[in-house]
UniProtKB/Swiss-Prot annotation:
Pfam families: Acetyltransf_1, Acetyltransf_7. This is Mycothiol acetyltransferase. It catalyses: 1D-myo-inositol 2-(L-cysteinylamino)-2-deoxy-alpha-D-glucopyranoside + acetyl-CoA = mycothiol + CoA + H(+). Keywords: Acyltransferase, Repeat, Transferase. Catalyzes the transfer of acetyl from acetyl-CoA to desacetylmycothiol (Cys-GlcN-Ins) to form mycothiol. InterPro entries: Acyl_CoA_acyltransferase (IPR016181), Bact_Acetyltransf (IPR050832), GNAT_dom (IPR000182), Mycothiol_AcTrfase (IPR017813). It is an enzyme of class 2 (transferase). Acetyl-CoA 1 binds at V83, A84, V85.
Length: 323
């Protein structure tokens, strides 16, 4: 027998159970079912910005958490959700029950569900629920250190055009100083990207508290005249290898953004290279990144630097009229 609890607040015991479930799913599938953003909501609370749906089953050891879903709620946008079911409790209809629960709580804005890794079971579940493929996020990778199967990438030097170098300087992010200006530029750079562009000061500060945060790998290009941030490249290091290695740390192009006023200046490419050189100098063997498959300029840039497609995450959805 199963029971689904819907809440926006998790107890310490529920937090521990969800994190353990997420780890079990990642170990079984080789890919995380819950994103970094969702895990931050688990640890710090949704605080009115989302809902948790927890699926419990009665087992010999008592009631246990067998699955969970989280729906991120943003004004004017469809709910953005993820679903995870414990490996030992699959094929019991829990995934479909969680999807139905998500849909029951979605309003007129609709529902979007992310399937990380584009695995066959997720495709089948989406089809059974009448969900359509709407978007894909590519995961690309680049070898920074040569291996038997992949030679090390050759990285050009991150040189600004002379006229751009006269106007901007590239330095590292200053915690406690740059937050508000970075949020301004991030919102402008990602005005058409709701997940990234809507980041708040609280979201940023939560990431600053994460073990992986390192301001020495967070590069900002600052307008010498106005002091405004013209662009940035935030890098990240995954100590667990992120599925690319057997536990050896790898790097990530976490996010690159350029203010619309500076687009076309070559600043994005230079900032990307600055971060890649930083990650290579740390001795990391690989670097990965995520990019929307429809973002052709970004895909072209990353391919020109030697990145190749590795995996993809797929967004499925439907609108309320399709119930």
């Amino acid at each position: 027998m199963s029971h689904i609890l819907t809440t926006d607040t998790l107890s310490p015991e529920q937090v521990a159970a969800v994190l353990a479930l997420a780890e079990a799913v990642r170990d079984a599938d080789g890919v995380a079912a819950l994103s970094e953003q969702t895990l931050l909501r688990v640890r710090h609370g949704a605080r009115g910005r989302g809902r948790f749906h927890l699926a419990y089953v009665d087992a010999e050891q008592g009631r246990v958490l067998a699955g969970c879903a989280f729906a991120e709620v943003s004004p004017g946008e469809p709910d953005s959700a993820e679903v995870a079911v414990a490996p030992q409790w699959r094929r019991h209809g829990l995934g479909r029950r969680l999807l139905d629960e998500l849909w029951a709580h979605a309003d007129a804005r609709g529902l979007r569900v992310w399937a990380h890794g584009d695995l066959a079971p997720a495709r089948a579940l989406a089809a059974s629920a009448g969900l359509q493929r709407m978007r894909a996020l590519w995961k690309m990778r680049l070898p920074l250190r040569g291996t038997d199967s992949a030679p090390a990438a050759t990285l050009p030097e991150p040189a600004l055009r002379p006229e751009v170098a006269q106007q901007v300087e590239i330095r590292t992010f200053r915690v406690g100083v740059d937050e508000q200006e970075w949020l301004r530029t991030n919102a402008r750079a990602f005005a058409d990207h709701p997940e990234q562009g809507a980041l708040t000061l609280e979201d940023l500060q939560q990431r600053e508290q994460e073990p992986w945060f390192d301001p020495e790998g967070f590069f900002v290009a600052v307008d010498r005249g106005s002091g405004r941030i013209a662009g940035f490249h935030w890098t990240k290091v995954h100590d667990d290898g992120a599925g690319l290695t057997d536990g050896e740390p790898v790097g990530e192009v976490y996010v690159v953004g350029v203010d619309p006023d500076w687009q076309g200046s070559g600043l994005g490419r230079v900032l990307t290279l600055r971060g890649l050189h930083h990650l290579r100098d740390r001795g990391l063997p690989w670097v990965l990144l995520y990019v929307d498959e429809e973002n052709r300029p970004a895909v072209q840039l990353y391919r020109s630097l030697g990145f190749e497609l590795w995996e993809s995450d797929v967004m499925y959805g439907r609108v309320p009229e399709e119930r």
